[in-house]
Amino acid sequence: LSEVVFRAAMSFDVAALHPLIERAYRGETAKAGWTHEADLLFDTRTSAEELAGLIADPERVILLAHDGDILIGCVQVARAGQDLAYLGMLTVEPTLQASGLGRRLLDAAETEAVARFGARRMEMTVIRRRAELIAWYRRRGYAPTGETRPFPVDPPRPELEFVVLEKAL
């Protein structure tokens, strides 16, 4: 990776952002990386319409990572309470996973949470069965709170329960 530049997503970014997220989370392309959900979930991760709504929401930001003109990653940060921010949709181009970009996106998200929302804590959720991903976040200072949340699908899939992790910023 040469010069990685981070910036907030804007509405015109949806056309490039949506396929990146789908490539990283679902289907055969996701299997080029180690953080995919392709073996657990078979539908789409998000939609272009949902992304446009997230980008337009003043209570959240999606940070993009570019290497030159190429979109290579993103992460979402949202205000979740008085001093709490929520981290979600951390995405790295599958062929670039394990390059350190995820860590850089996480650092940028934490910095943005403090600067934009005045957060002193960051919360996130990870599917309980993703032990290797939970371990990755634990190495970066996130700890399980003991709280769990249902995975938002109908009909419910209890085996996909979320574990809540939190870190002081």
Task: State where each predicted segment sits.
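A conserved beta-turn-beta hairpin within the catalytic core of GNAT-like acetyltransferases
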Residues: 79-90, 97, 116-120
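Conserved N-terminal entry element of GNAT/NAT acetyltransferase domains
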Residues: 1-15, 19, 163, 168-169
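Conserved beta-strand in the GNAT
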Residues: 64, 70-78, 86-91
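A short, internal acetyl-CoA/4′-phosphopantetheine-binding micro-motif in the GNAT/acyltransferase core
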Residues: 64, 90-98, 126-127
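Conserved acyl-CoA
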Residues: 104-121
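A short helix-loop-beta-strand connector motif used in the catalytic cores of GNAT acetyltransferases and
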Residues: 46-63
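Conserved GNAT-fold acetyl-CoA-binding loop/helix
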Residues: 22-50
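C-terminal "cap" of GNAT-fold acetyltransferases
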Residues: 118-143, 147-169
